[in-house]
Amino acid sequence: MEKLFHLKENHTDVKTEVMAGITTFMTMAYILAVNPSILSASGMDANAVLIATSLAAFVGTMCMALMANYPFALAPGMGLNAYFAYTVVLTMGYSWQMALLAVFVEGIVFIILSLTNVREAIFNAIPLTLKSAVSVGIGLFVAFVGLQNAKLIVNSDSTLLTYQHFKGETFHSVGVGALLALIGVLIIAVMLIKQVKGAILYGILITWVLGIVCELAGIYIPDPDAGMYSVIPTAFVSFDFSSLGKTFGQVFNLDFSNFNIVNFIVVMFAFLFVDLFDTLGTLIGVASKADMLDEDGKLPRIKGALLADAVATSVGAVLGTSTTTTYVESSSGVTVGGRTGLTATTTAVLFLLASIFSPLFLTIPSFATAPALIVVGFYMMGAVAKINFDDMTDAIPAFLTILVMPLAYSISEGIAIGIISWTLINVLTGKAKEKKITPLMYVLTVLFILKYIFL
């Protein structure tokens, strides 16, 4: 174990790493329920997608552990799965098999880019100030996702968003869930202040147990139409894997009769773009939080991390799921001390077990995992202290990066706005030479501008 993961060198131990891996899994487990729900809208079998999701997460996260020795976990990405189902299939009219082909090709392109150091060069070209801003922006993004998952922040026709009202007919479902999420935040906060190891994991489990008690007492009433399901497990294991055959290998079973090469390239590039910068943003944010970046702001062994992400995407497409990517929820495990691939290995094994214990894992409610995301968001805000607000050419792009991520609901959009604004502001103020803007930053700026014009 020591030879494989270098625990002493990273100032950690087996217990801490395992606890961190469990914590990461618990905050990511929702993807096992959400991904099948989204991709089934494209005509894919929900049970097959669930198994493919758990297997893709296992393969990707194990690759991360063994190729890079980092505590980062992978799974089919949110946002990309919605683009897959609702845009590529339902709007553009492609079959889900063709959409899987686009994901598969994207993964192959990523493997090539990773082996040729292109992705690593992009990572290293981003200035340290923007890397800190990305960490803060991701923190706000994660906290916002947590507030949404808890139903504490909901849609509003008049103000776009508003807080959850605790009166009315939805109180015993959405309202109680939101209150339990608030209690969960308090539980985690108190345990963190008391320096209880595994506070985030315990917070998730305690909130889940409170939900079970409330449901048994009739205080919490499930309402599937509102996304509030029963939190009491009705079964623990399922050994039926036959449904995987409905998606496995279907990426190569295609009908090219309505194939349009231009549209296909656009779709593939869209997957490529979002996955590339979401992954880079996540690696920057989580690694920054764990103090894994060196003094130049570079991430050691990044090639292995990027290659693991690329391999996972192509493998996931063959299994039958949308783009597999590095998850920002990995920061929850890092927050409780995860520093090596042993954390990722633990998470990977749990995803593999999830394919068997899916009935149990799928009952973990979103209001139990939401507090973890909110607290992780708080932790990631600490990177704001690394931003030099005395230098406006750094501070304004950093601010825009932080602002756009949660409001645009996109890590990649925040990075795009940050890079464009940082380059243009420094050029227009005559500080291009002083800031040593690399040619790659100019290229990225032009590409991002073209993306907003044509895509």
Where are these regions (language model features)?
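Alpha-helical membrane-protein architecture signal
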Residues: 11, 15, 183, 265-269, ...
